[in-house]
Amino acid sequence: MRFRWTLGLVFCLAAPRQAEAHASLLSSTPANGAVLSSSPLQVRLVFSEPIVADLSHVILASSSGRLVKLESRGDPHDVHAILAALPSLAKGGFRIDWHIISADGHPVAGSISFSIGALAAPPIRTTDAEHILDNHEPMVAGAALYPSLLRGLALSALLALCGLLGFAGYSSAPTRRQKRVCNWLSVAATILLAGHLVSWLVHVSPAKSLDSDIARSALSREVGLNELVRLVLTALAAWAVLLARRMRLAFAFALAAVLAGGVIGHPAAIDPLIAIPSKAIHLVGVAFWLGGLLWLVTSDAESGDVVTTAAIVSSVSLISIVVVALTGVIQALLFLAAWSDLFSTAYGLTLIGKAAGLISLAAFGAYHRWRLMPTPNPEGGTNLVGSVRKEIALMIAVVLLGGFLAYVPVPQMHAMNTKPTSQQGSR
């Protein structure tokens, strides 16, 4: 039965959805399919979210097969729009291919066509055009597979590091095993975040390759700087753990890196004044929850303090559960256009999966608190640690799902997905 439910969820997530996108094209000038009497001076594209104009690419294709890369810029009167000057055009059919990066760091590509003089067929897409704007990469439910997987793994390591350092810096002296785990987590988090950054730079590139010019532009803008700042803070935490041997300083850097994650992804584009602090607090709650569990399983079982440590961890976890649940609901209300999106969109179905995981984790916590912790004998402590290991495995799976969720397009009810407009949410 569980396998059937899992298979059903995967099938639903893999199915194409029409009501969701990262940033959707709302309108264009010239309009898609328009027939003009004379050559327009410029093209204007308006999207559903703020975009990073400096990272946009606009290409003009003529019926002769000629491709012209247009100089694009942001509309000074609208952060949702870009402008591109057009050369003088003769009569015939034309296609505008565009590739933009929305404020949440996700690439979107598409095209519009128009004619001058009389209705004409749009230019046939050539191999050269596909090379310039290559939107083909492994995708699941509209999310780029490799960046989302690396994001989930990196986030798991960073959150675990932050939480464990919090206990190590402000609780009793950490054991040798706990210090060793902190060392490995600091290295893993730094490497995985660096890998995610490279993967993201490839993801946002129009040609889906690591381009030095595009990387330089992306990292000099807020959308890329946020990723870079998080990586640097994590590297500083690793330095404090491995070289300086100062747990509290390492915790400060790791906590700052976790908080920096609040401005990355969907919150940067959708109600940021509420979404950013909500996500930041959400991540901190998960960090202390996961870190507490790791602190418990890495404690010295022979010292006889497992149950005492479990009581402290249980109290922290209870607070974390409440914080994570409340902030999760707030983000769901911001990102879901309607409650029906929970069951009709990939984002909603993924959110249901994450919520089910959190409920299961809460059930684990209740089982530990009221069934295993009251057991006074050593066997109870052993059983508790074994059960907590299972809870950690489930929590990592939920965090991986959260990393995937950050790349899944949120529902867009107000997007103008008209039939003649060709658009791809980096699919």
What are these regions (language model features)?
Residues 1-4, 390:
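Positively charged n-region of N-terminal signal peptides that target proteins for export
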Residues 6-14:
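Bacterial N-terminal signal peptides
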Residues 16-18:
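N-terminal signal peptide c-region/cleavage motif recognized by signal peptidases
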Residues 21-38:
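N-terminal edge beta-strand
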Residues 24, 83-91, 95-427:
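Polytopic transmembrane helical bundles with strong interfacial aromatic enrichment
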Residues 36-38, 75-77, 89-91:
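Surface-exposed coil/turn segments at beta-strand junctions on protein surfaces, enriched
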Residues 43-72:
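Short, surface-exposed alpha-helix to beta-strand junction/turn motifs within ectodomains of secreted
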Residues 77-83:
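Aromatic sugar-binding surface patches on proteins
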